Amino acid sequence: MTINLSDVYQGYIDCLNSQDWGNLGDYVGAEVSYNGKRIGLDAYRQAREKEFRDPDLHFEVRILVSDQKTVASRLEFDISPSGEFLGLPVNGKRVKFSENVFYEYEGGKIVRVWSVLDKATIAAQIARSWCEAPANKRRTR
């Protein structure tokens, strides 16, 4: 029987969006690798939990392509992180950005993830909002 990875992946996204951490192992392998480094399920879960400290985080699938062992997805985000985000001083500003991510599956579970976040778009939005702010409201470093 062939597994439909598009359906499995949507289940994974639903698991993330509902923050159902106890069931993350149903979708992610115990020895998962992230961007070429083996981190394991516990570290992967902790990273996702940390991302959800931003209360308006929601994974929105815009593009999804799959075959028998690979999923490619473009995710979109519209969030207002406090403080720094990806090393950038977002400080509560609303930012919209994308992530292009590839997943390799074995036995119906994610075993390898390659992720590229559009950090340049976030930086441009921060710079634009800083330039548009009145001089007396600008935060300096």
Predicted regions and their residues:
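C-terminal and inter-domain tail/linker signature
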Residues: 1-141
